[in-house]
């Protein structure tokens, strides 16, 4: 259980206090240093801290606010580098390495592609990314290195973010044709989501539990049966940086895998399939969710409404 007296939590709270007192979260030497320190403090996976078991209200409030500050700073960082990349006279995609977290996106994209390949029998023709932002690196990495014939539809509520993002791919002969940008609040749209084989939900869409669950419920209502949703989550100390998506939040979906990286890729990955299609029929009676401990990681048991049959969902960690 995490509390104020825990040394690591104290360090996180100290960094939170410094960050929350900054005049601006836009990239600067001070901002960059503080967030680097925060990330390095939260990266270790050899910890018994489970933020879902926190009962200290001060720590809980701090975590909620810190996640929002991290999201705001990440948005500014992406805007900053997207504008720089867009100013290159040649193809901006040739210079993606200048973005400080580009290697993380390469690793995350490979991880998500591998997980997707394990649970799908065909290559997706159309993918939606909700909350793509000014620097849609997940879509770019997947399109460029893993899904060369797939069309990516990127949705963001911010028109300026989409302008910056579309400029990044506008001089690439391939991606300029396969990356499409939509300025809309897709979570208010009732049509269109059923045309995608795979839907990605960005970590920054739904920064608190209530809004994250609301976004998931909207996807469940409007995605095609059998389509796959991929979400970003967090585990251990990393949940001080990003919201957690629990399998219990995914009502109407069959959760296939929850993967917790142990390297410098911060986000956990959750992959689930919309029930109702041929693949999801066996999970149509899913009711409540129970977490069961195991020696190497954790296994989620999904019980049906009668509490009799069990379907095991794979949840594994790279710490083994």
From Swiss-Prot:
Any one biological process term the GO annotation gives: response to zinc ion
Under Gene3D superfamilies, the record lists: Vaccinia Virus protein VP39 (3.40.50.150)
| A Gene Ontology molecular function term of the record | nicotianamine synthase activity
Signal peptide: which range, if any? none
The reaction(s) annotated as catalysed by this protein in its Swiss-Prot or TrEMBL entry are: 3 S-adenosyl-L-methionine = nicotianamine + 3 S-methyl-5'-thioadenosine + 3 H(+)
Q: Does the keyword Membrane apply?
A: no
Key words of the record:
S-adenosyl-L-methionine, Transferase
State if Lipid biosynthesis is listed as a keyword: no
Under the heading PANTHER family, the entry gives: NICOTIANAMINE SYNTHASE 2, NICOTIANAMINE SYNTHASE 3
What protein is this chain from?
A: Nicotianamine synthase 2
What organism does this protein naturally occur in? Answer: Arabidopsis thaliana
């Amino acid at each position: 259980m995490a509390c104020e007296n825990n040394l690591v939590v104290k360090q996180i709270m100290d960094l939170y206090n410094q960050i929350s007192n900054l005049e601006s979260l836009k990239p600067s030497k001070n901002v960059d240093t503080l967030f680097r320190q925060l990330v390095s403090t939260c990266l270790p996976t050899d910890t018994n801290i489970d933020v879902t078991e926190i009962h200290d209200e001060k720590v809980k409030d701090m975590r909620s606010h810190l996640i929002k500050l991290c999201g705001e700073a990440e948005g500014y960082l992406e805007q900053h580098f997207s504008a720089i990349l867009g100013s290159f006279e040649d193809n901006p995609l040739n210079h993606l390495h200048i973005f400080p977290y580009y290697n993380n996106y390469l690793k995350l994209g490979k991880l998500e592609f591998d997980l997707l390949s394990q649970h799908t029998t065909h290559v997706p023709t159309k993918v939606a990314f909700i909350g793509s932002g000014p620097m849609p690196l997940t879509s770019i990495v997947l399109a460029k290195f893993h899904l060369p014939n797939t069309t990516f539809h990127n949705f963001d509520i911010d028109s300026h973010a989409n302008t910056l993002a579309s400029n990044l791919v506008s001089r690439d002969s391939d991606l300029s044709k396969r990356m499409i940008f939509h300025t809309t609040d897709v979570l208010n749209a009732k049509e269109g989501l059923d045309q995608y084989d795979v839907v990605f939900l960005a970590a920054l869409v739904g920064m608190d539990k209530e809004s994250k669950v609301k976004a998931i419920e909207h996807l469940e209502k409007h995605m095609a049966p059998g389509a796959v949703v991929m979400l970003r989550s967090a585990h251990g100390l990393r949940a001080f940086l990003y919201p957690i998506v629990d399998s219990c939040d995914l009502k109407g979906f069959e959760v296939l895998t929850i993967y917790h990286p142990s390297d410098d890729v911060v986000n956990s990955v959750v992959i689930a399939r919309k029930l109702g299609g041929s693949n999801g029929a066996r999970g149509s009676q899913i009711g409540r969710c129970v977490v069961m401990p195991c020696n190497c990681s954790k296994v989620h048991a999904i019980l049906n409404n009668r509490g009799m049959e069990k379907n095991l969902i794979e949840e594994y960690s790279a710490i083994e």
